[in-house]
């Protein structure tokens, strides 16, 4: 069973944002980045994720990350400590994954992050990016762009996958092949079958 979460992000007005505003970067945005540079936030996320794993008997945990964090980190950094929030955030992310792997040795951590945005050497030691790019999610899927992105990528991350939302287009479908492949049967280019609204 796979659990798909985006634990580093919160919405304004949610229980977490109201109860712990000090755990959020003070950037007025639709999405708020959690202060993973703080140990108490890492501990909170660890306990929350563990509760889901234990309750739902999770075997694969997908951690997504669909936001641009740089401005949040820069807003929080002190003038003479530029970059420290980012460094601490990433170090605590690694520690979070290490703690999860120590507690659940057979847990698969799928590092989604908009597909392939966290494929540094340290992340690859702890997690696998099964979903290699969110470019597949675009209505105007460009098979050539996907092939260009994948040139050389499969040597570094051979077990990754994609989806093709244009069934019947052999070239687009084959451009999306990988060890993991998802077919989207409901979203096509046919005018008699519009894209789903959700």
Q: Positions of the model-derived regions?
A:
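Hydrophobic faces of well-ordered beta-strands that scaffold small-molecule active sites
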Residues: 1-5, 61-63, 110-111
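Active-site-adjacent "subsite" loops/lids of carbohydrate-active enzymes
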Residues: 2-55
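Histidine/acidic-residue-rich catalytic or RNA/ligand-binding cores of hydrolases
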Residues: 12-18, 71-76, 118-128, 195
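Acidic, His- and aromatic-enriched active-site or binding-groove loops in soluble protein domains
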Residues: 21-35, 86, 129-144
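Alpha-helix N-cap and loop-to-helix initiation/capping positions
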Residues: 40-41, 81-92
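Active-site-proximal substrate-binding groove within the catalytic cores of carbohydrate-active enzymes
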Residues: 93-198
